């Protein structure tokens, strides 16, 4: 572990994990170089990052930040960081797994907003949709309620204004 390359990789991993509240551990074995490259691109578009490193280095970096994933780091593993859109990154992983007959990448577990989660939680998160689509839905719901509220206020204003106009006439 003491070789210089491992030390550099560990330092890089530590830096990448700084401030990250959501990440996923995935099995990527069986993906072709082209599929892995496409997966990296899709994850990057969602504001995430896919890191392939030795399990020992990933485990050390995670343990130093108080997160133990030694049980999930068996076999070829990659760390997928989700800085901006955790649901979007989870969906990119899910879509990639559905896009091939092997179901790869296979999610082994994750850490979402400070809590360790299992595969089922990550799959549910992936089904939510991206942050942008959820924000769009929220804006739609809020604007509908605000429109109704404005309609009520206008009706009440007309009722009050109509009574005052009749008294003056």
Swiss-Prot record:
MF terms in GO: large ribosomal subunit rRNA binding; structural constituent of ribosome
Self-association and partners: Part of the ribosomal stalk of the 50S ribosomal subunit. The N-terminus interacts with L11 and the large rRNA to form the base of the stalk. The C-terminus forms an elongated spine to which L12 dimers bind in a sequential fashion forming a multimeric L10(L12)X complex.
Role played: Forms part of the ribosomal stalk, playing a central role in the interaction of the ribosome with GTP-bound translation factors.
Pfam families: Ribosomal_L10
Cross-referenced NCBIfam families: PRK00099.1-1
Disulfide-bond pairs as recorded: none
One GO cellular component term noted in the UniProt record for this chain: large ribosomal subunit
GO biological process: translation
Keywords: Ribonucleoprotein, Ribosomal protein, RNA-binding, rRNA-binding
Ranges in a coiled coil: none
Taxonomic superkingdom: Bacteria
Keyword Transcription appears in the UniProt entry: no
Phylogenetic lineage: Bacteria, Thermotogati, Deinococcota, Deinococci, Deinococcales
The protein's name in its UniProt record: Large ribosomal subunit protein uL10
């Amino acid at each position: 572990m003491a070789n210089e390359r491992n030390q550099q990789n560990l330092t890089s991993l530590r830096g990448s994990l700084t401030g990250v509240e959501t990440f996923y551990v995935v099995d990527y074995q069986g993906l072709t170089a082209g599929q892995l490259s496409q997966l990296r691109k899709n994850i990057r578009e969602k504001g995430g990052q896919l890191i392939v490193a030795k399990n020992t280095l990933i485990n050390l970096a995670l343990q130093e930040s108080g997160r133990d994933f030694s049980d999930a780091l068996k076999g070829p593993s990659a760390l997928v960081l989700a800085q901006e859109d955790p649901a979007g990154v989870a969906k990119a992983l899910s879509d990639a797994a559905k896009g091939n007959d092997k179901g790869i990448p296979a999610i082994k577990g994750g850490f979402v907003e400070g809590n360790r989660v299992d595969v089922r939680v990550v799959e549910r998160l992936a089904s939510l949709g991206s942050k942008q689509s959820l924000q769009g839905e929220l804006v739609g719901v809020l604007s509908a309620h605000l429109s109704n509220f404005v309609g009520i206020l206008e009706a009440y204003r007309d009722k009050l204004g109509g009574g005052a106009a009749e008294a003056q006439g």
